[in-house]
Regions:
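Glycine-rich beta-strand-centered segment in the early N-terminal region that forms part
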Residues: 21-36, 45-122, 681
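Mid-domain Rossmann-like dinucleotide-binding core that forms the NAD(H)/NADP(H) cofactor-binding site
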Residues: 148-223
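Rossmann-fold NAD(P)-binding glycine/threonine-rich loop
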Residues: 270-289, 293, 299, 490-511
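Predominantly a Rossmann-like dinucleotide-binding segment in NAD(P)-dependent oxidoreductases
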Residues: 298-316, 332, 510-511, 518-598, ...
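Contiguous beta-strand/loop segments that form the cofactor/metal-binding neighborhood of enzyme cores
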Residues: 357, 361-384, 567, 573-650, ...
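N-terminal Rossmann-like dinucleotide-binding module
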Residues: 380-440
Length: 716
């Protein structure tokens, strides 16, 4: 399919052939007919990408702070690799489209194939022939509304949410500052609400358009008669409400709004404007009220609402972002809004770059609503494309399912120089698949994992997708006779584990490896070489200052990420098995009991594990510590010897009253990948036995049981 994309590193805009997106739960697959360019927002996005590295840093100081913090934690080189991965990426543009449903997995069965729908959402409702959009960001189009009009729906919902925040009453005076596309729609919504509307803009053409389309009394910001016009319009009182829909780097819109508002008036900010609020002479003396309007409305930026498809109760949240979208289309259907006169340009998707020449000012021509049109194309639903990248020449044909930042930083680069051919990279998002394929030299980019399993010549599958898909992809690999490396965790529950175990009992062909990398770190191997000679039981103490992860992060969702016990603590259980050379037989666990709604209690946990050979492991895992404390400390005791690893940056051996320092070179990511490929080349067993992988995974589930019951759990 064709899609407009931007190279975030170079800023280049172009239309490319990409694999069509795959469909997953709570999503709707839509074939676009039209999409709307949001000139203000998208111009800003494009200009950021086209700026220099210093320019990007100035516009996102929060990310600069993250980089500096990451350097302290992971070192300069590892951080540089992460930054390169982020910069060397392709970005989707657009967030307001209209088209036809081609398939749906929405949880309510609301959307049927062939229905006309409007779609919203950055990275979802993109300028592409086909899009996959979360169900709560899709609404049906009324019969008498055209695709062209419906493509305005996202912008309409943004404008409508700004009006709802203003809560205007019949007959109130409302000023709209900024008469671009968003401001023009806002003026029409206010007029439909029975308000007396006044518009201000720096552009004379936008002022005239507002007068023509919505019959809004409007004036240029630079007009010397502005204050007189405001006094006349408001009968000397000032405006009841002011809605700022402008995008401006200066403080002028906020200062002007304070000046022309009435005493106890309200200012609602919808656009991206500077907000240095001057206390004097107006905000304080007029007791002005300032409100923010958040995008399309309630539900925006809530992953549970947008990504999982969980709606808010109608009686308690009347106007969600989806219901705002519906309300906007209802007004269009009733003839209350005139959108056709706001459409100034329409381009076919092949000419999308020309549209952005208008937006960026490369072509000096007035514009308001710019639409992209999607003509018929027989290839728009293809889920795989071949790349022009020069493929690697190894013997082992290798594919990746999932290629996020972790895979791009720690897995794919470590295959370089090994006896592999990078065949196909599969992601849900065609942009990411194409980007990774080109960057690392994969022969093909795809959004359909089944193609890999059906390929008889494919030998190895790396699974680096979201945790809830791991078990399914591992099972398919075993069933199709392919070797599989899956990032932790192996699976999310005992049912999935039992299913994989059953397949492994009859498996004589596939190696299964889980990304428990720490046991492969050189400093860990050196310690283990010493302690493996000691036959008596050992004590292993591990302290992990893991750091806070918000409750709405996908890894914290039990059904998707499994939580940190299943998704992260498995690392350290495997490491304990490595040092004790034994399997867990019993586990004791308890977590904090906090009343904070921000804290996830089992992110802060103390665990004791008894091993079959009499060894003991103690794990303290916390999310409520301070970032300045190094993340991990490991201590191993046995045979009158002590070994220590400090955050995998250095270590020490304490023996015979002497201390021997150990140097560290990473957490074992490159070594684990090399060991896995070597075992395939030589036809030997997996570097980590399935029995050990099974024991580690089962122990994480028993830890959850121990917390729930307050009782120690036996591990069989």
């Amino acid at each position: 399919m064709k899609q407009l994309i931007q190279n975030f590193k170079t800023g280049e805009l172009y239309v490319d052939e990409l694999p069509a997106p795959s469909l997953s739960n709570a999503m709707v697959l839509v074939e676009n007919e039209f999409s709307l360019i949001s000139a203000g927002t998208e111009k800003g996005t494009v200009k950021v990408a086209q700026s220099s590295l210093i320019g990007k840093a100035k516009q996102r100081p929060d990310l600069v702070a993250q980089v500096l913090q990451n350097i302290k934690k992971e070192g300069l080189m590892a951080t540089l690799e992460k930054v390169r991965t982020k910069l060397d990426s392709l970005k989707a543009l657009g967030y307001s489209t209209a088209g036809v449903v081609k398939a749906s997995m929405d949880t309510n069965g609301k959307f049927k194939v062939g229905e006309r729908v409007a779609c919203a959402g950055q990275d979802y409702a993109s300028h592409a022939e086909v899009v996959a959009v979360p169900q709560n960001l899709v609404v049906k189009i009324p019969d008498n509304v055209s695709f062209e009009e419906a493509s305005f729906t996202t912008l309409g919902a943004i404008a409508l949410q700004g009006v709802r925040q203003a809560n205007p009453k019949l007959g109130e005076t409302v000023c709209v500052i900024g008469l671009g596309l968003l401001g023009q729609i806002t003026c029409q919504l206010l007029a439909a609400n029975g308000c007396r509307v006044f518009g201000i803009d720096v552009s004379n053409s936008m002022v005239e358009l507002a007068k023509k389309v919505s019959k809004t009394e409007s004036i240029s910001r630079n007009d010397a008669g502005l204050k007189t016009a405001v006094e006349t319009f408001t009968r000397g009182y000032g405006f009841d409400k002011i809605i700022i829909t402008a995008a401006a780097p200066t403080n002028d819109p906020i200062e002007l709004s304070a000046e022309i508002a009435r005493k106890k008036g309200e200012i609602i900010i919808v656009g991206a404007v500077k907000m240095d609020l001057p206390r004097e002479p107006y905000f304080f003396k007029k007791e002005l009220e300032l409100k923010m309007s958040c995008s399309y409305g309630p539900g925006r930026y809530d992953k549970v609402y947008e990504e999982l498809g969980n709606d808010y109760p109608f009686a308690y949240v009347r106007w969600t972002e989806q219901r705002n979208m519906e309300a906007f289309l209802d007004l269009v259907a009733l003839g209350r809004l005139n959108l056709k006169e706001l459409i100034t340009h329409t381009f076919d998707i092949d000419d999308a770059v020309k549209a952005y020449d208008l937006v960026l000012g490369k072509v000096q021509e007035p514009f308001v609503g710019i639409l992209l049109r999607y003509p018929p194309n027989d290839n728009k639903h293809s889920k795989q494309i071949n790349t022009i990248a020069k493929p690697t020449n190894g013997k082992i044909k290798t594919s990746f399912i999932g290629a996020g930042s972790f895979a791009q930083s720690y897995l794919i680069p470590n295959l370089k120089g090994l006896n592999v051919t990078l065949d196909t990279v599969i992601t849900n998002n065609g942009i990411n698949a194409k980007n990774v394929a080109g960057k690392f030299g994969f022969a093909a980019a795809s959004t359909d994992a089944n193609q890999v399993y059906q390929d008889k010549n494919a030998q190895v599958v790396f699974v680096a997708s979201r945790h809830d898909s791991h078990a399914m992809y591992v099972e398919k690999a075993i069933q199709s006779g392919k070797h599989v490396f899956v990032e932790k965790p192996l699976c999310l529950n005992e049912t999935e584990l039992a299913s994989i175990q059953t397949l492994m009992q009859n498996n004589t062909q596939s190696l299964v490896m889980v990304g428990f990398n720490r046991r492969f770190a050189p400093v860990a191997v050196e310690l283990n070489n010493l302690f493996s000679k000691i036959t008596e039981p050992k004590v292993v103490n591990i302290r992990v200052n893991a750091g806070f992860i918000p409750l709405d992060h996908w890894t914290q969702q039990a059904e998707i990420g499994g939580g940190r016990i299943v998704g992260e603590i498995c690392h350290f259980i495997d490491l304990m098995q490595f040092f004790t050379n034994s399997t867990p037989i019993k586990v004791y666990a308890d977590c904090i009991s906090s009343n904070s709604i921000q804290a996830k209690n089992d992110d802060n946990i103390a665990i004791v594990i008894r091993f079959a050979n009499g060894s003991i492991g103690n794990l303290t895992y916390v999310a409520n510590g301070d970032k300045s404390l190094p993340k991990e400390r490991i201590e191993v005791f046995g045979g009158n010897i002590c070994g220590v690893i400090n955050d995998f940056k250095d270590g020490a051996i304490y023996k015979n009253n002497k201390v021997t320092s150990l140097k560290s070179s990473g957490k074992g990511h490159s070594q684990e990948v090399a060991a896995f490929i070597k075992s395939i080349e030589q036809g030997t067993a997996s570097p980590i036995s399935f029995e050990s992988i099974h024991a580690t995974t089962l122990t994480t589930f028993k830890i959850l049981d121990a917390i729930r019951t307050g009782l120690p759990q036996t591990i069989n």
